[in-house]
Amino acid sequence: AKFVASLIVIGIMLFVLGFLVMGFGLIAIGIPPTAEEFWRIVFFLITSIFYVAFWLNLAILFSLRFRQAATSALASVAVWLFFSVFYTMIVNLVAKGLSPSQMASPYQIISYQKFILGLMRLAPSELFNEATTTLLMPSVRSIGPLTMEQVQGAIPSPLPLGQSLLVVWPQLTGLIAATVICFAISYIMFMRREIRSR
Protein backbone atom coordinates (compact mmCIF):
# COMPACT_ATOMS: atom_id res chain seq x y z
CA ALA A 1 0.00 0.00 0.00
CA LYS A 2 2.85 2.38 0.83
CA PHE A 3 4.50 1.68 -2.52
CA VAL A 4 1.30 2.02 -4.57
CA ALA A 5 0.24 5.25 -2.85
CA SER A 6 3.69 6.81 -3.27
CA LEU A 7 3.87 5.74 -6.91
CA ILE A 8 0.44 7.20 -7.66
CA VAL A 9 1.45 10.55 -6.16
CA ILE A 10 4.75 10.55 -8.08
CA GLY A 11 3.00 9.55 -11.31
CA ILE A 12 0.47 12.37 -10.97
CA MET A 13 3.26 14.87 -10.29
CA LEU A 14 5.27 13.71 -13.31
CA PHE A 15 2.29 13.93 -15.64
CA VAL A 16 1.30 17.36 -14.30
CA LEU A 17 4.86 18.67 -14.75
CA GLY A 18 5.11 17.10 -18.21
CA PHE A 19 1.87 18.65 -19.40
CA LEU A 20 2.85 22.00 -17.87
CA VAL A 21 6.09 21.95 -19.86
CA MET A 22 4.10 21.07 -22.99
CA GLY A 23 1.73 23.96 -22.31
CA PHE A 24 4.55 26.46 -21.79
CA GLY A 25 6.23 25.19 -24.94
CA LEU A 26 3.01 25.63 -26.89
CA ILE A 27 2.65 29.20 -25.60
CA ALA A 28 6.30 30.05 -26.34
CA ILE A 29 6.59 28.42 -29.76
CA GLY A 30 3.00 28.54 -30.94
CA ILE A 31 3.23 25.21 -32.75
CA PRO A 32 1.18 22.37 -31.24
CA PRO A 33 2.76 18.91 -31.10
CA THR A 34 1.57 16.25 -33.49
CA ALA A 35 -0.32 13.21 -32.21
CA GLU A 36 2.82 11.06 -32.44
CA GLU A 37 4.91 13.65 -30.56
CA PHE A 38 2.25 13.83 -27.86
CA TRP A 39 2.25 10.05 -27.41
CA ARG A 40 6.05 10.00 -27.36
CA ILE A 41 5.96 12.39 -24.42
CA VAL A 42 3.31 10.27 -22.70
CA PHE A 43 5.44 7.12 -23.06
CA PHE A 44 8.46 9.10 -21.85
CA LEU A 45 6.53 10.00 -18.70
CA ILE A 46 5.45 6.36 -18.24
CA THR A 47 9.08 5.26 -18.58
CA SER A 48 10.05 7.86 -15.98
CA ILE A 49 7.45 6.40 -13.61
CA PHE A 50 8.97 2.92 -14.06
CA TYR A 51 12.42 4.34 -13.33
CA VAL A 52 11.25 6.16 -10.21
CA ALA A 53 9.35 3.03 -9.12
CA PHE A 54 12.60 1.06 -9.08
CA TRP A 55 14.34 3.53 -6.78
CA LEU A 56 11.22 3.82 -4.63
CA ASN A 57 11.11 0.04 -4.21
CA LEU A 58 14.81 -0.02 -3.41
CA ALA A 59 14.30 2.64 -0.73
CA ILE A 60 11.45 0.60 0.78
CA LEU A 61 13.67 -2.48 0.71
CA PHE A 62 16.43 -0.68 2.62
CA SER A 63 13.91 0.75 5.10
CA LEU A 64 12.83 -2.82 5.88
CA ARG A 65 16.40 -4.11 6.02
CA PHE A 66 17.75 -1.37 8.30
CA ARG A 67 15.80 -0.25 11.33
CA GLN A 68 17.30 3.24 11.50
CA ALA A 69 15.91 5.70 8.95
CA ALA A 70 19.27 7.44 8.49
CA THR A 71 21.01 4.16 7.64
CA SER A 72 18.40 3.18 5.05
CA ALA A 73 18.53 6.65 3.48
CA LEU A 74 22.33 6.57 3.28
CA ALA A 75 22.23 3.08 1.75
CA SER A 76 19.78 4.24 -0.93
CA VAL A 77 21.90 7.29 -1.76
CA ALA A 78 25.05 5.14 -1.84
CA VAL A 79 23.52 2.72 -4.37
CA TRP A 80 22.28 5.62 -6.49
CA LEU A 81 25.71 7.30 -6.44
CA PHE A 82 27.44 4.02 -7.30
CA PHE A 83 25.33 3.40 -10.41
CA SER A 84 25.20 7.07 -11.44
CA VAL A 85 28.90 7.94 -11.03
CA PHE A 86 31.26 5.12 -10.12
CA TYR A 87 29.77 2.27 -12.14
CA THR A 88 30.49 4.03 -15.43
CA MET A 89 34.09 4.61 -14.34
CA ILE A 90 34.50 0.93 -13.45
CA VAL A 91 33.07 -0.19 -16.80
CA ASN A 92 35.41 2.22 -18.61
CA LEU A 93 38.39 0.68 -16.80
CA VAL A 94 37.20 -2.80 -17.78
CA ALA A 95 36.71 -1.62 -21.36
CA LYS A 96 40.28 -0.30 -21.54
CA GLY A 97 41.67 -3.51 -20.10
CA LEU A 98 39.75 -5.74 -22.51
CA SER A 99 39.97 -3.55 -25.61
CA PRO A 100 40.76 -5.64 -28.73
CA SER A 101 43.92 -5.12 -30.73
CA GLN A 102 44.06 -3.15 -33.96
CA MET A 103 44.27 -6.43 -35.88
CA ALA A 104 40.97 -7.70 -34.48
CA SER A 105 38.23 -8.63 -36.91
CA PRO A 106 35.04 -6.54 -37.16
CA TYR A 107 33.03 -9.32 -35.50
CA GLN A 108 35.45 -9.40 -32.55
CA ILE A 109 35.09 -5.65 -32.18
CA ILE A 110 31.29 -5.90 -32.30
CA SER A 111 31.33 -8.71 -29.72
CA TYR A 112 33.52 -6.55 -27.48
CA GLN A 113 31.17 -3.58 -27.88
CA LYS A 114 28.14 -5.75 -27.10
CA PHE A 115 29.85 -7.06 -23.96
CA ILE A 116 30.67 -3.56 -22.70
CA LEU A 117 27.17 -2.38 -23.58
CA GLY A 118 25.75 -5.32 -21.63
CA LEU A 119 27.79 -4.30 -18.60
CA MET A 120 26.54 -0.73 -18.91
CA ARG A 121 22.95 -1.93 -19.09
CA LEU A 122 23.24 -3.45 -15.63
CA ALA A 123 22.80 0.12 -14.37
CA PRO A 124 19.15 1.27 -14.21
CA SER A 125 20.18 4.79 -15.24
CA GLU A 126 21.64 3.44 -18.50
CA LEU A 127 18.41 1.58 -19.30
CA PHE A 128 16.45 4.76 -18.59
CA ASN A 129 18.75 6.93 -20.73
CA GLU A 130 18.57 4.54 -23.69
CA ALA A 131 14.78 4.26 -23.46
CA THR A 132 14.13 7.98 -23.17
CA THR A 133 16.62 8.92 -25.89
CA THR A 134 15.00 6.51 -28.34
CA LEU A 135 11.47 7.59 -27.44
CA LEU A 136 12.14 11.33 -27.70
CA MET A 137 14.38 11.17 -30.81
CA PRO A 138 12.75 9.36 -33.76
CA SER A 139 16.07 9.54 -35.64
CA VAL A 140 17.56 6.94 -33.26
CA ARG A 141 17.12 3.63 -35.08
CA SER A 142 19.27 1.36 -32.91
CA ILE A 143 20.91 1.45 -29.48
CA GLY A 144 23.51 -1.21 -30.11
CA PRO A 145 26.43 -1.86 -32.47
CA LEU A 146 25.53 -2.79 -36.05
CA THR A 147 27.46 -4.57 -38.78
CA MET A 148 27.84 -3.16 -42.29
CA GLU A 149 25.44 -5.84 -43.55
CA GLN A 150 22.79 -4.57 -41.13
CA VAL A 151 23.37 -0.94 -42.09
CA GLN A 152 23.17 -1.57 -45.83
CA GLY A 153 19.66 -1.20 -47.17
CA ALA A 154 18.37 0.67 -44.13
CA ILE A 155 16.16 3.63 -45.00
CA PRO A 156 17.47 6.81 -43.28
CA SER A 157 14.08 8.02 -42.04
CA PRO A 158 12.66 8.64 -38.56
CA LEU A 159 11.16 5.62 -36.84
CA PRO A 160 7.43 5.62 -36.12
CA LEU A 161 6.33 5.38 -32.51
CA GLY A 162 5.53 1.68 -32.70
CA GLN A 163 9.02 0.83 -33.96
CA SER A 164 10.64 3.02 -31.29
CA LEU A 165 8.67 1.13 -28.63
CA LEU A 166 9.92 -2.16 -30.07
CA VAL A 167 13.50 -0.88 -29.88
CA VAL A 168 13.22 0.15 -26.22
CA TRP A 169 11.06 -2.78 -25.10
CA PRO A 170 14.06 -4.70 -23.62
CA GLN A 171 15.04 -1.61 -21.60
CA LEU A 172 11.49 -1.18 -20.31
CA THR A 173 11.32 -4.89 -19.46
CA GLY A 174 14.59 -4.60 -17.53
CA LEU A 175 13.32 -1.66 -15.48
CA ILE A 176 10.02 -3.41 -14.73
CA ALA A 177 11.82 -6.66 -13.80
CA ALA A 178 14.18 -4.85 -11.42
CA THR A 179 11.19 -3.10 -9.82
CA VAL A 180 9.28 -6.36 -9.41
CA ILE A 181 12.32 -8.10 -7.90
CA CYS A 182 12.82 -5.33 -5.33
CA PHE A 183 9.10 -5.37 -4.53
CA ALA A 184 9.07 -9.16 -4.08
CA ILE A 185 12.08 -9.09 -1.76
CA SER A 186 10.53 -6.25 0.27
CA TYR A 187 7.23 -8.12 0.53
CA ILE A 188 8.93 -11.33 1.70
CA MET A 189 10.96 -9.44 4.31
CA PHE A 190 7.84 -7.62 5.52
CA MET A 191 5.81 -10.84 5.82
CA ARG A 192 8.61 -12.62 7.70
CA ARG A 193 8.83 -9.74 10.15
CA GLU A 194 5.06 -9.79 10.68
CA ILE A 195 5.04 -13.55 11.26
CA ARG A 196 7.89 -13.33 13.78
CA SER A 197 6.20 -10.49 15.66
CA ARG A 198 3.09 -12.62 16.10
Write out the residue ranges for each language-model feature.
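Terminal transmembrane helical anchor/hairpin motif
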Residues: 81, 85-172, 184
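Transmembrane helix-loop junctions in multipass membrane proteins, especially transporters and channels
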Residues: 22, 26-34, 64-68, 92-100, ...
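Junction motif at the cytosolic side of a transmembrane helix
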Residues: 173-198
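Residue-level recognition of pore/gate-forming positions within transmembrane alpha-helices
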Residues: 6, 10, 14, 77-81, ...
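A structural motif at transmembrane helix-loop-helix junctions in multipass membrane proteins
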Residues: 44-87, 92, 101
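Short helix-to-coil transition segments within interhelical loops
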Residues: 1-2
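Secretory targeting signals
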Residues: 5-67
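Membrane-embedded alpha-helical segments of multi-pass transporters/permeases
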Residues: 15-26, 85-89, 183-188
